[in-house]
Regions:
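Generic hydrophobic, amphipathic alpha-helix propensity
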Residues: 4-15, 29, 54-58, 62
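Helix-turn-helix
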Residues: 7, 15-49
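Hydrophobic/aromatic-rich alpha-helical bundle segments in the mid-to-C-terminal region
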Residues: 111-117, 121-189
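Solvent-exposed, amphipathic alpha-helical segments
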Residues: 11-18, 65-68, 143-150
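Conserved, surface-exposed functional patches that form binding/active-site neighborhoods
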Residues: 91-98, 106-109, 113-117
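Hydrophobic alpha-helical connector segments
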Residues: 53, 60-99
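Short alpha-helical scaffolding segments that buttress acidic/His motifs in well-ordered protein cores
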Residues: 86-90, 99-106, 140-147
Length: 189
């Protein structure tokens, strides 16, 4: 069951995707959410709190889902679990407004995205630690970032199927170069 605060944040995401943050007002959020201005202000006292609420919600959800999936993949003995989880979360988010909202916020309100930057750095380190080749690890990070940015900017010209093929190929190459695979190969020699 969606809470009132979540309903308001959904409205903020939609508005930020359409109008950006500069035209975002409490009145506009209230209208988009179908509630009174007082109802919005009861949950969020300012535009800044609304924007931070969107960022925190996305960061929390992505972090929790990525680590939960990574833990499950680790239990299954799958190579590069954080990388695989990151691509899976991308697939789940590619039709949602959250990445577009985050991109708009980063462009217009860069001081608000520190939590997102921290999460990105955290995932980057985790992915890099899974892959034995540092250049390949960096390539994987750039591919993930590029997929999100292209989606957020609506400039993706590849179909979902083509992107899935790209992701499968990256995961295949990464798995062959995972620290787990390298350790197993060395143990076999």
């Amino acid at each position: 069951v969606e809470t009132t605060a979540e309903h308001i944040l959904d409205a903020v995401e939609r508005l930020v995707c359409i109008e950006g943050t500069r035209k975002l007002t409490i009145d506009a959020v209230a209208a988009e959410a179908g509630m009174s201005k007082g109802g919005v202000l009861y949950n969020f006292r300012s535009k800044q709190e609304l924007l931070l609420g969107v960022i925190r919600r996305v960061v929390t959800e992505v972090r929790e889902r990525t680590y939960a999936l990574s833990d499950k993949l680790t239990e299954q003995g799958v190579a590069c679990p954080i990388l695989r989880a990151s691509f899976q979360i991308y697939k789940e988010y590619r039709e949602k407004t959250a990445p577009k909202a985050l991109f708009a916020l980063a462009a217009q309100e860069p001081e608000l995205v520190a939590e997102f930057q921290d999460m990105s750095t955290e995932f980057g380190r985790a992915i890099s630690s899974e892959i034995s080749d540092p250049v390949l690890g960096h390539m994987c990070l750039l591919i993930i970032d590029g997929l999100y940015y292209r989606q957020a900017l609506d400039i993706e010209h590849c179909s979902a199927g083509e992107i899935d093929e790209l992701i499968d190929r990256v995961l295949e190459i990464s798995s062959q170069n995972s620290r787990h695979a390298v350790l197993n190969a060395e143990a076999g020699n």
